[in-house]
UniProtKB/Swiss-Prot annotation:
Binds 1 Mg(2+) ion per subunit. This is Molybdopterin molybdenumtransferase. Its cofactor is Mg(2+). One of its GO terms (molecular function) is molybdopterin molybdotransferase activity. Keywords: Magnesium, Metal-binding, Molybdenum, Molybdenum cofactor biosynthesis, Transferase. GO terms for cellular component: cytoplasm; cytosol. It comes from Synechocystis sp. (strain ATCC 27184 / PCC 6803 / Kazusa). One of its GO terms (biological process) is Mo-molybdopterin cofactor biosynthetic process. It catalyses: adenylyl-molybdopterin + molybdate = Mo-molybdopterin + AMP + H(+). Belongs to the MoeA family. SUPFAM superfamilies: MoeA C-terminal domain-like (SSF63867), MoeA N-terminal region -like (SSF63882), Molybdenum cofactor biosynthesis proteins (SSF53218). Pfam families: MoCF_biosynth, MoeA_C, MoeA_N. The gene is moeA. Catalyzes the insertion of molybdate into adenylated molybdopterin with the concomitant release of AMP. Its EC number is 2.10.1.1.
Length: 390
């Protein structure tokens, strides 16, 4: 078996590029840019007023003038105006272009206005450019404002729409099929007999993928029949770029999948990781059809943990154990936990250990899992470890 770190490195090294596509900005939330975005103009395009108040010439204020005649009002969204007399001032609104001949804005809170006269009631020292957002201080036209591979979250949307982008080039998300296997599984609409289980695993995997922006996820089921598995694979590899199998990858008599994949020319990169749960995990590539093959254990906790740890591109945060915990096997252990936060902004992780990887009901109160390192048996309260959220 290989280590968790080695498995991560192998998957990252062999994960294919699924290409890119152009789409409307409206539907691009959460996608990853496949192009760099450049500013189409200076930003701000002109000196911009940052506070409602009055605009005036700093030189007059610096020379001691504290009373100014009010000569007009400038609203946001109007062409740039000009101050005709430097002994006067103009009312200006946030977002307006700073009038010509003005280089100082004084907020309403620091002036008194009566009978078209403005009195400065806070005669403090001021500098030119106060409450002014200078032209091109954020960026010049032509500057790259979002790098390729940036994720299109809320701030990124603000940026690209501010510069007139209505369509963006993004990395293509693959078509995915999740395949449950096993003669013991029945539809969730059926009432299972005592020797049967509802095939719930794949729904947990599906919503986990959908929560990360993978919307094109199909579900199907296969019996423990080698010929059925072969026929399905030969068709599915042409329709989907990623095939995720749940179950059928261990050493049981009816665990045909690794044998079938080898027979059909899949290149195996991983089969067995020194971890609990999820030890039998499989990863391979069919290089002829460029299809990714992911084999997850059939136990619910194992499949969810492996998906989140290796295939959802999740960056961990670090959380602190609330109590001592012991795990004596020489394996990386993924420990379900419930998070809480202290007033000092410390993230605490309360262990919710399970008896076995089929005890999925115990996950109901958990927020995710800690990754406890291999070659360590005792983990002390207060120690910090990587946390992955469901």
């Amino acid at each position: 078996m290989i280590s968790v770190a080695a498995a991560v490195e192998i998957i990252q090294a062999h994960w294919p590029n699924f290409g890119d596509t152009t789409m409307d900005v409206d539907g691009s939330y959460g996608r990853v840019l496949a192009e760099s975005i450049e500013a189409d103009r200076d930003y701000p395009p002109g000196d911009r007023v940052m506070m409602d108040g009055v605009a005036l010439a700093w030189s007059e204020y610096h020379q001691g003038r504290r009373h100014f005649k009010l000569l007009g009002t400038v609203a946001a969204g109007t062409p740039q105006s000009s101050l005709p007399d430097q002994t006067g001032c103009l009312e200006v609104m946030t977002g307006a272009l700073l009038p010509q001949n003005c280089d100082l804005v004084i907020p309403y809170e620091e002036v008194a206005i009566a009978d078209n006269q403005v009195k400065i009631i806070n005669p403090r020292q001021r500098e030119p450019g106060e409450f002014v957002h200078p032209k091109a201080s954020d960026c010049r036209a032509g500057k790259v404002i979002l790098e390729s591979s940036s994720k299109l979250n809320g701030p990124a949307w603000n940026i690209i729409t501010s510069f007139g982008k209505t369509k963006v080039r993004v990395k293509q998300k693959p078509r995915i099929q999740i395949i449950s296997t096993g003669d013991e599984l029945v539809e969730i609409t059926q009432k299972p007999k005592i020797h049967q289980l509802r095939r719930s695993n794949i729904y947990g995997l599906q919503v986990s993928l959908q929560s990360r922006g993978f919307q094109n996820v199909n579900l199907t089921h296969l019996a423990d029949d080698k010929e059925v598995i072969i026929r399905h694979y030969q068709k599915a590899k042409l329709e989907y770029r990623v095939l995720i199998y749940s179950g059928g990858i261990s050493k049981g008599k009816f665990d045909y999948l690794p044998e079938v994949w080898s027979q059909l020319g899949v290149t195996k990169y991983i089969h067995g990781v020194a971890q609990k749960p999820g030890k039998p995990m499989y990863f391979g590539i069919d290089h002829r059809s460029k299809t990714v093959i992911i084999g997850l254990p059939g136990n619910p906790i194992s499949s969810l943990v492996c998906l989140h740890r290796y295939f959802l591109d999740s960056a961990p945060i670090y959380a602190q154990l609330t109590t001592d915990f012991t795990f004596k096997k020489d394996l990386t252990y993924f420990l379900p936990v419930k998070l809480s936060h202290t007033p000092q902004a410390v993230i605490k992780a309360e262990p919710l250990p399970v008896k076995n990887s089929g005890e999925f009901i115990a996950l109901a109160g958990s927020d995710g899992f800690l990754e406890l390192p291999q070659h360590q048996a005792s983990f002390q309260a207060g120690e910090c470890f990587p946390f992955y959220a469901w």
